[in-house]
Amino acid sequence: MAYSIANNQLLRKNFAKIKKIIDIPNLIDIQKNSYKRFLQIDTPPEARKNSGLEAVFKSVFPIKDFSDTASLEYVTYTLGAPKYDVEECHQRGMTFAAPMKVKVRLVVWDVNKDTGVRSIRDIKEQEVYFGEIPLMTENGTFIINGTERVIVSQLHRSPGVFYDHDKGKTHSSGKVLYSARVIPYRGSWLDFEFDHKDILFVRIDRRRKMPATVLLKALGYSAEALLNYFYKSEEILVAAEGMWKKADPELLASQKASVDIVAPKTGEVLLKANRKFTKAAIRKMTEHGITQIPITMEEVLGKYASNDIVDPSTGEVIVECNDEITQARLDDIKAKGITEFKVLFIDNLHVTSSLRDTLIADKIAATEEALIEIYRRLRPGDPPTLKSAQALFENLFFNAERYDLSAVGRLKLNFKLGLNVPLDCQTLTKDDVLEVVRYLIDLKNGKGTIDDIDHLGNRRVRAVGELLENQYRIGLVRMERAIKERMSLQEVENLMPHDLINSKPVSAVVKEFFGSSQLSQFMDQTNPLSEVTHKRRLSALGPGGLTRERAGFEVRDVHPTHYGRVCPIETPEGPNIGLIASLSTYARINEHGFVETPYRIVQDGKVTSDVKFFSALEEEGHAIAQANAEMDADGRFVNEYVSARKSGEFLLVHRDELELMDVAPMQLVSVAASLIPFLENDDANRALMGSNMQRQAVPLLKADSPLVGTGMERVVAKDSGVSVVARHTGIVESVDASRIVVKIDEDEFDETGTGVDIYNLIKFARSNQNTCINQRPVVKVGDHVKRGDVIADGPSTDMGELALGQNVVVAFMPWGGYNFEDSILVSEKLVKDDRYTSIHIEEFECVARDTKLGKEEITSDIPNLGEEALKDLDESGIIRIGAEVKPGDILVGKITPKGETQLSPEEKLLRAIFGEKAGDVRDTSLRVPPGVEGTVIGAKIFSRKGADKDSRTEMIERMEEDKLRKDEQDEIRIIRNSAVGKLKKLLVGKSAAVKVEDKSGRTVIAKGAAITEEALDAIPLDRWDEISVSGEAGVDEKVSAILQTLQQQIDIIRYVFDDKVQKLKRGDDLPPGVIKMVKVYIAIKRKLQVGDKMAGRHGNKGVVSRILPEEDMPYMEDGRPVEIVLNPLGVPSRMNVGQILETHLGWAAKGIGWKIEEMLESYSPADHIKGYLKDVYGTTEMDTFLDSLDKDELMNVAKRLQRGVAMASPVFEGASEEQIRSMLDKAGFDETAQVSLYDGKSGEPFKHKVTVGVMYVLKLHHLVDDKIHARSIGPYSLVTQQPLGGKAQFGGQRLGEMEVWAMEAYGAAYALQEFLTVKSDDVAGRTRMYEAIVKGKHTLEPGLPESFNVLIKELQSLCLDVELLEGDED
């Protein structure tokens, strides 16, 4: 075949200017890898890493009892095979999960009471069933109770330390107050903050604040130790002739000289008094050997002692540490003959006295008091003891069970504070606390930077695995409490591990997480793109995240670090804007949960082919060139200065300073945005709408891939998992609508494999959004397929490419007001050709229960119904497949026993004569709800185990079994044929060592004769092992090995299929009280109609306002009518010019197709067609491909291109205006793409030329059929007796205050009275009205509206005694 699927991608002309560097990573890897890391299902237990589930078990176990005489230890866990496969879970409404068993060891100790020595008494090991754990399907989803769900990844604040300030808002003076916060992964938060007096406070868990030194003292530091940690000291020398200080170059740099500094030998003045110590002056002093500097007494006064100053003779403390040096104290020091002492270096410029002031404000001296003070703050009301205070403090930050920074938190702490603590130390250390405080003080003193919490280095992603890991930990901790209690209540030595463990709490937590967590969502299955996008979504909401109300503008905003990591375009409109984002195309998530994006490495101005992934923190400070920077053939930058990004700024950087380069222009946008051609020409707001609306496109009956795409269509279709991809290379053996059989190439499969792939296609299944999932084969028998090729298209895919809409010819012009305000005028031809027809499948369920009054029964024998109503039901009471149904029709007949009523004597007599029948049951059949009209396409019946099966169930089972048997026979046939082929290769032509006879005793192969194919065919395969070959070693062994393998493979296949058949015939697990459940599926064909919403890919949306006959549409000179007319005013103010460029390029693509069609119709020579195609494509790759085709193949390609030549205009490197003009020229059109149009009604030409082209238009999920609704008589509200509202409740139309005014203005008094009484809540009036109509009288007698009674009761409840007095008018 000339255009196999593989070659089809060549047929899309690509305008990309940049060669592809790396492939886009698999789009749903974010889900799959995370869950794989969590379960480690393919890793042998002993090789498992300490992460995911393994880490959870290791962190909770061992569990010891209170007396420490027994411990329950964890060994390993294993996962079994799931009970049902994915398909069965869908059908039966089950959860796709694997049973988990955990091997635990119970160790019992003997403790010697005198010595306290422990010895092991007993060890018991056992595997304990630990509930089920949901498994992820191939496509990254979970099946919970039969529905597909997705766990959305959460973007939350990373653990670590964060510095911030209040921007001067807290205190009236406008002073900036700095604060630090240590956030662990789990555990207590620690906050440090300054107040307006520069005193440092600490809060634990946002409780009341206390001086920070209380915490530091509780850590065991004395006041002296703290002062010497946070401040440098100056040494003061005292003598009779004056005072000096030691010259410390580090401290001098910020000081002034108080007296002239003179060189001792030369007498030269090195620095005059009151001059700053410059670097040069300090250098000179060092050269002249000056180690001490003369100072005045004033300089020393007001300084603070850095340690106790002691009288050397008596040991008496003259000045205590942290005391101020006053004149009296200085005189005392001199008098006692002390020659040197140290003072704190505080200059109030670079070093402030805040920590010293805090120590003064803090009235607590010793560690013990500090611990008790902290205990009082955290547990007010509890009497503190030193032991309990110590235990509490220890548990707060230093106990790994209570406090966990996680590897990420430790990494961030080390990174910010420059520490070297190993990553596996995941609690706080004393040094951490000191360094956090030191950095905060430095920050206040003007060193260091505050953190930006919206930087992606400070936000990380928690994907499925991690979210589930946290839930599992919660469950295990709950279980741990129960186990400890059991261990202390019972004699442990008599127990086995399974007596202690009850896994219910764990299963319950997991079930709750998947069932009702905010991050576990019903998968958006409208089309393949919406599936992929849903799995790649990042949400800042959810448990442990933000809430909509609290999130400000900064969090929602686009941040420079989002580049290449999070899409700046795709986010919902409305209250969630910015809180829910999408991963960019090339982004991935590293093991720490940070989002990474790939860059090419640049060395010495030359771009290498190395690609490396960088997180937002690693990228800081690097200069990064754009992907479209000009380069020569060697990969050097052409321009000397290149536009680049560096630390969030856009700069011009010299080419030698560049370190990295983007890998692709579309690196910064998400999958949905990368599907919009000419995105660069659209306004961002409209691009946002465009990327969101593509997710709402309904799969159409006839998928049609876009003529103007971006080249991403194939990637999305393949990674979404809706199309069927070949698992191995091989040859297609057989194809029908529901399955494809591929015989695998011999070099592909191992000896154990069966050598056959059977792909069962999904036919007309219902998606979560009620759209239709259907797969169609795109290969023929005999085709050779490669591993990874698409062999069957799914919904919204066309030849392996995503196809969400249709290519239609559009004209931009007003037409009779029908395209006012974004309305769309559509040609009837689109409806007639089923271009926008979609199929929707509704599921209806009928349950027969065991009630108190007796069993409900599903049957066709329903009382008081005529033949007509039952004509489509079979004898089991279930509607036949293929029946056309409309609202009110019976789908499943069901009768329910009625409560016994008092019977009259006559009835009793009749019952006695005719037996109990019609009287005691009522009809509760499942009927078609209003607004549904379609064809029944399937029915499934689930019945209790052990219940009798009805004829319909048996028929369904037979059909399913036949299908399975056919698969089994095909597999056996193919592997048998393949084995026979191998054997014949070995045997034919060789000479036989023994003679072989057939059943009748006739010799088929004589001894010594050459073995022929005919002879082999005459012997049944199971007797081929009797054949022996002479003269060649090893052949007999090979033959018997092949036959043995064949037999084993056949046995395996039979075993697997028998198991499937057994499952079919087994009863179903139904909820308690349910006897039988029937599900009926109805397919509804929805044609395009007025009121349906349609949209382009550029945010240009509208509603169909009129469907015009084809002959009335504006037409071109050659008589071709346009298919859609859009309003030209929809473009300028919205600034989405991309739609015009798309229209122009689409017009060229269509025109080229028409030219090829003309050539084919006029039988142009093949070379002429080939030349034209080469001219259009203009790539050497395509030239080679076209040259490799023979004439027939070339004609096939040309036929495929008649509908138009598909183009790819990738995002940010799309077709230029020149290229579009040249394409229009090749199509033989005017460069402006404007055409003279004629009015379809009058035949007159329109005054001006009109822009006409081909646009890709989608039909969205907002269909008028789902919204339109009318009520006759329906349910009423209980209290007010007014009709309910809304389609779901079969409600009425609200008539509000303004509508009443309108009726009053018209003077329509009686109509209004009717609206407000009998048509609404006048209960008696409603009945009278009904009676009047039945009797044929047409009089209106309105009574009291029920809402009046409600009002009176309301007033009475306010103790106002209001009553209605009734009387005659006179």
Curated annotation (Swiss-Prot):
NCBIfam families: PRK00405.1, rpoB. It comes from Geobacter sulfurreducens (strain ATCC 51573 / DSM 12127 / PCA). The keyword Transferase applies. GO terms for biological process: DNA-templated transcription. This is DNA-directed RNA polymerase subunit beta. The RNAP catalytic core consists of 2 alpha, 1 beta, 1 beta' and 1 omega subunit. When a sigma factor is associated with the core the holoenzyme is formed, which can initiate transcription. SUPFAM superfamilies: beta and beta-prime subunits of DNA dependent RNA-polymerase. Its EC number is 2.7.7.6. The gene is rpoB. Belongs to the RNA polymerase beta chain family. DNA-dependent RNA polymerase catalyzes the transcription of DNA into RNA using the four ribonucleoside triphosphates as substrates. One of its GO terms (molecular function) is DNA binding. The keyword Transcription applies. Keywords: DNA-directed RNA polymerase, Nucleotidyltransferase, Transcription, Transferase. InterPro entries: DNA-dir_RNA_pol_bsu_ext_1_sf (IPR042107), DNA-dir_RNA_pol_bsu_external_1 (IPR019462), DNA-dir_RNA_pol_su2 (IPR015712), DNA-dir_RNAP_su2_dom (IPR007120), DNA-dir_RNAP_su2_hyb_sf (IPR037033), RNA_pol_bsu_bac (IPR010243), RNA_pol_bsu_CS (IPR007121), RNA_pol_bsu_protrusion (IPR007644). It catalyses: RNA(n) + a ribonucleoside 5'-triphosphate = RNA(n+1) + diphosphate. One of its GO terms (cellular component) is DNA-directed RNA polymerase complex. It comes from the Bacteria.
